[in-house]
Regions:
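Short alpha-helix
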Residues: 198-213
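N-terminal auxiliary segments of SAM/dcSAM-dependent transferases
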Residues: 1-18
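Short, glycine-/aromatic-enriched active-site segment of Class I SAM-dependent methyltransferases
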Residues: 171-197
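A short acidic, Gly/Pro-enriched loop at the edge of an enzyme's catalytic core
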Residues: 123-136
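Conserved Class I S-adenosyl-L-methionine
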Residues: 219-279
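Class I SAM-dependent methyltransferase SAM/SAH-binding core
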Residues: 63-65, 74-122
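A short glycine-rich, Lys/Arg-flanked "PGG" loop and its adjoining helix->strand segment in the class I
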Residues: 149-164
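Conserved alpha-helix/loop element of class I SAM-dependent methyltransferases that forms part
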Residues: 29-33, 39-60
């Protein structure tokens, strides 16, 4: 038990510095309209975060958990625009340390904290009592979990009645000529292998897991319906993935190449989810 989670933690020992160097504090896809309008990856990411905060109904004084908070960009922005208290968690202390530093730089250490949890603590989130939080958020982090359903059950438990689960995540899907599992996995298996992902879910699969956890799904949306999901990372490598000269550059070059291939095939996408705990 825990081998996959340990692998993910070890991956981010190396990937964390690379991601921060290449992407800054914001590591997820942005709002599609903002990307199309030519906004920077960071501004597009903030635009999506602001929409997710609104969907969560977070207000000043509320309490939220941001799961898989990385180096803190999304967590800090959500706290800043909502006035809510946020706790960001990951299983990698280097990430947590960088996130704490970023929160201090942005002047929000009084409302945003970051904690490192155990490799398998996502299965229960036992540090949080039943019905204690107004929202649970995540950005492209649940994809790394082998037992995604356990996380959704834990999130549902710690939400207050009326509290909301909101997030975005990497997904796989049939697209164009790639319709069978075998055809899809031709492109997705290398992504899994190079980016330390046990398996990608589907839009319907995530909806089912969230509903099985006892939440009512209000939104389950493919953010790139009918189009290839390039986001802010087009194949011309504007962020410099192939020029990265830090530790293990070949790891990130291979990951970038595999992900670009899956994007080009159309079988990779990003989904948005909003769910509420019944009162």
């Amino acid at each position: 038990m825990g081998d996959v989670e340990q692998q993910v933690r070890a991956y981010y020992d190396v990937a964390g510095p690379a991601y921060e160097a290449l992407m800054g504090p914001f590591w997820h896809h942005g709002e599609l309209a903002s990307e199309a309008a030519g906004l920077s990856p960071a501004e597009s990411a903030k635009a999506l975060e602001s929409k997710m905060v609104a969907a969560a109904g977070l207000q000043s004084g509320g309490w939220a958990l941001d799961f898989g908070s990385g180096v803190g960009g999304a967590t800090v922005h959500m706290a800043s625009v909502s006035g809510a208290h946020f706790v960001g968690v990951s299983n990698n202390e280097w990430l947590s340390q960088r996130a704490r530093g970023y929160a201090a730089e942005q002047g929000v250490s009084d409302t945003v904290t970051f904690h490192t949890i155990g490799d398998e603590d996502y299965r229960t989130l036992a540090a949080w009592p039943d019905g204690s939080l107004d929202a649970v958020t995540w950005y492209e982090s649940v994809v790394h979990l082998p037992d995604k359903a356990a996380f959704f059950r834990a999130a549902a438990r710690i939400l207050k009645p009326g509290g909301r689960l909101v997030g975005v995540d990497w997904l796989q899907r049939p697209f164009g000529e790639h319709q069978t599992d075998e055809q899809i996995m031709r492109w997705m298996e290398p992504v899994n292998r190079h980016i330390s992902i046990p398996w990608h879910g589907t839009l319907d699969g995530y909806r089912a897991m969230i509903e099985d956890a006892g939440l009512v799904v209000e939104v389950a949306e493919d953010l790139y319906t009918g189009v290839q999901c390039w986001g802010s990372t087009p194949p011309e490598d504007g962020q410099g993935w192939y020029e990265y000269d830090g530790e293990a550059p070949e790891v990130f070059a291979e990951g970038k190449r595999a992900l670009d291939d899956a994007r080009a095939a159309g079988v990779f996408t990003v989904g948005k989810f909003v769910a509420v705990k019944p009162a």
